Amino acid sequence: MGFRELVSYNALGIVYPSNTVTTLRQTTSKNPELVEKFLKTLMEGIFIFKTNKEKSLAVMRKYLRGASQEVLEETYQYTTAEMEQVPYPSLEVITSGLDMLSFQYPQAKQTDPNLIFDASFVRRIDQSGFIAGLYKK
């Protein structure tokens, strides 16, 4: 019994917010160093996951107790293919999330996604060469 993918939103061209990082604007303005450190740690985690398969599988095995090696392998392959090397926030994903949220909270449809979207931290880290430096090692 292996990993059974029921649907691939990417293959169908459906934008879906599956992995998001959210914080308050107040936090980003009062403690930008913390936000940057968090994002760098996240990016290092993505790097390790994508480049150290054995370590990644060991962590998955620990937390997905009882999963067969086949399921772990297939999950790893699927996840690495879907995971962005540079996790820029996507206006399209945020808009899609607001659309889904509007089914339960109609006022979400009125929210301007630009008001809750900030790529400046990821852009600054990316432009600093931090991410490229990880993958050069």
Where are these regions (language model features)?
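Generic alpha-helical propensity signal that fires on short helical segments
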Residues: V21-L24, I46, G129-L134
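Periplasmic-binding protein-like
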Residues: M1-T28, L39, T75-Y78, A119-D126
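Conserved C-terminal helix/tail region of periplasmic/extracytoplasmic solute-binding proteins
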Residues: S102-K137
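Secondary-structure end/capping motifs
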Residues: K30-T111
